[in-house]
Design a protein with these regions (language model features):
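Non-transmembrane alpha-helical segments in soluble domains
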Residues: 8-11, 106, 182-186, 218, ...
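Flexible, small-/acidic-enriched active-site or ligand-binding loops
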Residues: 201, 268-316
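PLP-dependent aminotransferase-class I/II
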Residues: 1-6
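Amphipathic terminal alpha-helices
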Residues: 312-330
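A glycine-rich dinucleotide-binding beta-alpha-beta segment and adjacent secondary-structure elements
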Residues: 235-289
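Aromatic-enriched alpha-helical interface/lid elements that frame and gate functional surfaces
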Residues: 159-236, 240
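Active-site-adjacent "lid/gating" segments in soluble enzymes
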Residues: 8, 13, 21, 25-176
Length: 330
């Protein structure tokens, strides 16, 4: 009971409530949208579930890597060789849904400030993902069977993709956009005999012989460090980049020069490096980047100063376990 009391006070105080629980969880706790409207008619609530709050599969649970299957991305990323999708632990559908939800919540706040009431914004993660593949759905609708698993291949040229380099799990990406790029790549590779074949002179010919061409490029890249592949290609004007691990990004001269990497002193951890803002503006202030609080660090202050709760009541809630408070920093 005490915990619900805190949550209800929080809802009454808040402008925006964001929830990312499985379908029905908030209603079951007594803080669903109807409860939010009763407690605070001006509040905006943003909900994001895997498949949405209603529909035949609304009870499915999961996150980014799992929704890639239902959203069609795993199939599209597979290689067109009859084998199953290799799978991916990429979580970018989570980022898509979160950012769309934030935009929706901000739009609802703007609407409220212009005279509208509070609103409930919903983002189904599967729909956010499928929206990014809209051109593929349109192409398949216009020409059934035209969309196939692509792997790393591109319809814009060949060779194009990630190529193995010397060492364990080291790769470099090379993109040959046109015939001029192909001539430049041949020079970067030392113009091997197989690459001089006139049957590989045009983009169409190379795409038809994609496996042969990319196997030939892979034989070359496997003899070199990934950075060497990148540098040799870029020196000839061919788009290429090494695959970077996190430790590489921390030492990347370009990211350092742009000031993207932010050093931060984090309590209980020490010095850490954070990613900076993904966009900046000439009329925007510096990003608000600060150390994370410890669990319960601000509980008492927030309940008393922001929610207007009596300090004795807060003590009782802490003692009952309804509220966690950190009274002394470690």
């Amino acid at each position: 009971p005490g915990a619900i009391q805190i949550v209800e006070r929080l809802v009454a105080w808040a402008d925006v409530i964001v929830e990312n629980n499985s379908t029905g969880t908030m209603d079951g706790l007594g803080i669903g949208w109807s409860d939010v409207r009763r407690l605070n008619s001006e509040a905006v609530m943003m909900s994001s579930q895997l498949m949405g709050s209603h529909g035949l599969q609304a009870d499915w649970t999961g996150y980014g890597p799992t929704i890639q299957t239902a959203g069609g991305l795993s199939w599209l990323w597979a290689f067109d060789d009859g084998e199953g999708p290799p799978g991916s632990n990429a979580i970018h559908p989570d980022h898509l849904a979160g950012r769309l939800g934030a935009v929706g919540a901000l739009a609802a706040i703007i609407g409220r400030d212009r005279g509208a009431s509070g609103a409930h914004v919903e983002v189904a993660q599967v729909e956010a993902l499928m929206f990014t593949l809209a051109d593929h759905f349109l192409a398949e609708a216009l020409e059934p069977g035209s969309v196939r698993p692509r792997g790393n291949a591109s319809p814009d040229g060949a060779p194009w993709g990630a190529f193995p380099c010397a060492g364990e799990e080291n790769w470099a990406v090379i993109c040959v956009r046109d015939d001029d790029d192909w001539v430049r790549l041949r020079k970067a590779m030392g113009d091997p005999h197989w690459a001089r074949d006139p049957l590989l002179a045009t983009s169409i010919q190379r795409m038809e012989a994609r496996a042969r061409v990319e196997n030939g490029v892979a034989e070359w890249t496997q003899t070199l460090d990934r950075a060497e592949v990148q540098d040799r290609c870029q020196a000839k004007g061919v788009p290429a980049a090494r695959m970077m691990f996190c430790v590489d990004q921390l030492e990347d001269p370009h990211l350092i020069d742009r000031g993207f990497l932010v050093d931060l002193e984090q309590q209980a951890l020490g010095q850490i490096v954070m990613a900076g803002p993904c966009f900046t503006g000439s009329r925007m202030g510096p990003p608000a980047i600060f150390q994370a609080p410890l669990i319960g660090e601000h509980s008492r202050r927030f309940c008393v100063q922001d929610l207007g709760m009596d300090s004795v009541l807060v003590d009782d809630l802490v003692a009952s376990g309804a509220l966690e408070a950190l009274d002394e920093l470690p």
